């Protein structure tokens, strides 16, 4: 049976970079599950790579069709932004392993949908001061920086990824992203061990 490797972490902890590097490795034969969002596309993003970008009408249509596995809504200073996972044919756990990024709330919903055995959580940590600087640097590169939203998201993460919630979700293994090379090495070793052990047990 295949697994879904689920990357989590606070904003600007380096999840996107870790995701791209793990996919670049190619040694674990991980496939992507591209989530959907109604937020505006950022500079440097491409539709269908980090996310499928849609609007509220598109979300409601998929919801009515019963294709939304999990969804989250954030009341931002620019209106409601939704992030969601869709049962659109991307996921086949009979033989394939997948890699995706999400929130703790989404992880719990994915676990409820697919089962605990199908999901491998990978929680990425980084000092708050470093995260805040990274978030600011990213906004400065945008054509129209959204500083208010950056601050809202930074503060919301403290509640969304509180120690109590992490413990309740059963998140134990954590990976410090101060040094990207070491972080990637640790995650790769962790996943190779678990995916290999899982495959061997299924044979």
What kind of region is each of these model predictions?
Residues 13:
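ATP-binding Walker
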Residues 196-202:
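Conserved small/polar residues in nucleotide/adenosyl-binding loops
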Residues 16:
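Walker A/P-loop
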Residues 140-190:
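Small-molecule kinase domains that catalyze NTP-dependent phosphoryl transfer to phosphate-bearing small molecules
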Residues 7:
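Hydrophobic anchor at the beta1->P-loop junction of P-loop NTPases
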Residues 37-98, 102-104:
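ATP-dependent small-molecule kinase phosphotransfer cores
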Residues 99-103, 117-135:
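Conserved phosphate-donor/acceptor-positioning beta-strand/loop module used by diverse small-molecule
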Residues 10:
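P-loop (Walker A) phosphate-binding loop of NTP-binding proteins
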């Amino acid at each position: 049976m295949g697994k879904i490797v689920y990357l989590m972490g606070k904003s600007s902890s380096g999840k996107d970079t870790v995701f791209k590097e793990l996919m670049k490795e190619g040694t674990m034969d991980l496939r992507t599950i591209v989530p959907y969002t109604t937020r505006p596309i950022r500079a440097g993003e491409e539709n269908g790579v980090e996310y499928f970008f849609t609007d509220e009408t598109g979300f409601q249509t998929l919801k009515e069709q019963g294709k939304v596995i999990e969804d989250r809504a954030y009341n931002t200073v620019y209106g409601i932004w939704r992030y969601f996972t869709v049962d659109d044919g991307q996921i086949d756990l009979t033989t394939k392993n997948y890699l995706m990024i999400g929130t703790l709330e989404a992880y719990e919903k994915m676990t409820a949908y697919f089962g605990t055995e199908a999901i491998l959580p990978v929680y990425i940590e980084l000092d708050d001061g470093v995260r805040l600087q990274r978030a600011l640097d990213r906004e400065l590169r945008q054509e129209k920086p959204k500083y208010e939203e950056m601050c809202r998201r930074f503060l919301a993460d403290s509640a969304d990824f509180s120690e109590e919630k992490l413990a309740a979700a059963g998140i134990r293994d954590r990976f410090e992203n101060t040094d990207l090379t070491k972080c990637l090495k640790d995650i790769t070793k962790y996943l190779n061990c678990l995916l290999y052990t899982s495959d061997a047990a299924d044979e």
